[in-house]
């Protein structure tokens, strides 16, 4: 797991969108986005459609932008899965949707699946959005502030789930403004004002920070704990 940490406006979400190919043509992107030897910046639209949503999935910062307000949650999750698994049976599809939601601690399945997005809380929508990203069992998960709208108890459970997914072979890019949440990552990148200012293992960042901005973020964590 790789975590990108920085305050609001540091450029974290822009990095996520660049990785996912979601930046508008107003942006100029240099470098490479490599996935299994392919530079995604140079792939065809057809190839990208096969990769994004199936092999590389994105958890957006705002759950309300991820759902169609006119479709029930159950239908949206089924369409997300069926798009990349058209051979799946109806029974398998329903079971996969139910199991994925329960994995995120969502047990009131009947109500959730029949609900429209605006009938659910922000925290519940956040977890459903995470379920939508996990339903196709991606190899890479890009999570932009995935724990922000979730209460403390469910946040801990989600972070534990992310670690379990990593142990199972999934790679995760975990974006957060909170260094404490980033402590579960293997490596951390610190961003400030659109620039990468420090990178290292989690132990190095927490125990041997080199940059003043990193030290500032660490001191902010200490103050919050008090």
Locations of regions flagged by a protein language model:
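Conserved catalytic segment of ABC-fold P-loop ATPases
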Residues: 184-190
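ABC ATPase "signature
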Residues: 199-200, 208
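Conserved ABC transporter NBD signature motif
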Residues: 28-39
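Conserved ABC ATPase signature
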Residues: 115-120, 124
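A short, proline-enriched helix->beta-strand linker immediately N-terminal to the Walker B motif
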Residues: 135-139
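C-terminal boundary and immediately downstream tail of ABC-type ATPase nucleotide-binding domains
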Residues: 56-58, 107, 207-226
């Amino acid at each position: 797991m790789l975590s990108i940490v920085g305050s609001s406006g540091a450029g974290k979400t822009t990095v996520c969108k660049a990785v996912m190919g979601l930046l508008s043509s107003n942006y100029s992107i240099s470098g490479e986005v490599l996935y299994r030897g392919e530079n995604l910046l140079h792939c065809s639209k057809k190839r990208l459609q096969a990769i994004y949503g199936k092999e590389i999935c994105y958890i957006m910062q705002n759950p309300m932008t991820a759902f169609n307000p006119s479709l029930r949650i159950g239908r949206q999750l089924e369409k997300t899965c069926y798009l990349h698994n058209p051979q799946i049976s109806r029974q398998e599809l329903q079971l996969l949707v139910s199991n994925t939601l329960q994995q995120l601690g969502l047990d009131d399945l009947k109500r959730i699946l029949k609900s429209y997005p605006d009938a659910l809380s922000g925290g519940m929508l956040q977890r459903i959005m995470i379920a939508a990203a996990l339903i196709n069992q991606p190899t890479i998960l890009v999570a932009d502030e995935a724990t922000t709208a979730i209460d403390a108890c469910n946040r801990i459970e989600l972070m534990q789930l992310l670690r379990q997914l990593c142990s199972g072979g999934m790679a995760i890019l975990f974006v957060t403004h909170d260094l404490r949440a980033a402590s579960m990552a293997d490596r951390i990148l610190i961003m400030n004002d659109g620039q990468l200012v420090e990178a290292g293992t989690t132990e190095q960042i927490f125990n041997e920070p080199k940059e003043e901005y990193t030290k500032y973020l660490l001191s902010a964590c200490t103050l919050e704990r008090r």
